[in-house]
Swiss-Prot record:
Core subunit of the mitochondrial membrane respiratory chain NADH dehydrogenase (Complex I) that is believed to belong to the minimal assembly required for catalysis. Complex I functions in the transfer of electrons from NADH to the respiratory chain. The immediate electron acceptor for the enzyme is believed to be ubiquinone. Belongs to the complex I subunit 3 family. The keyword Translocase applies. GO terms for molecular function: NADH dehydrogenase (ubiquinone) activity. InterPro entries: NAD(P)H_OxRDtase_bac/plastid (IPR023043), NADH_UbQ/plastoQ_OxRdtase_su3 (IPR000440), NDAH_ubi_oxred_su3_sf (IPR038430). This is NADH-ubiquinone oxidoreductase chain 3. GO terms for cellular component: mitochondrial membrane; NADH dehydrogenase complex. It comes from the Eukaryota. The chain crosses the membrane at residues 5-25, 60-80, 87-107. It is a multi-pass membrane protein. The gene is ND3. The lineage of its organism: Eukaryota, Metazoa, Cnidaria, Anthozoa, Hexacorallia. Its EC number is 7.1.1.2. Its main location: mitochondrion.
């Protein structure tokens, strides 16, 4: 069947099991007594300067999300460039459609003013 993917499957299963073990151990062994220090906001080791939960600019959040989207796009482009000549017709047009959708999304965001920093 797909024997070349067994290594990835084993790695995936190992990662999930190890994550579950570590999370379970943290939950079981962790201290569950909340006090003032545990429920207060953490600001780089200093006492909080203001009230916790101050709102931040939603623009900052949107720019961060856009950065993550286009950062993931680059992570898809690098492996595609390596095997482009092996998957030429289908892989090429698939990536062109992928890039076109992302470009249309960027143009839409630009026209709606999502990239303006005020």
């Amino acid at each position: 069947m797909y024997t070349e993917f067994y290594g990835i499957l084993v790695l995936l299963i190992f990662s999930v099991v190890l994550s579950a073990i570590i999370s379970g151990a943290s939950y079981i062994l962790g201290d569950k007594q909340p006090d003032r220090e545990k429920v207060s906001a953490y600001e780089c080791g200093f006492d909080p300067f203001g009230t916790p939960g101050r709102p931040f600019s939603i623009r900052f959040f949107l720019i961060g999300i856009l950065f993550l989207i286009f950062d993931l796009e680059i992570s898809f482009l690098f492996p595609w460039c390596v095997v482009c000549n092996q998957v030429f017709p289908f892989g090429y047009w698939t990536m062109i459609v992928f890039l076109a959708v992302l470009t249309l999304g960027l143009v839409y965001e630009w026209l709606k003013g999502g990239l303006e920093w005020e």
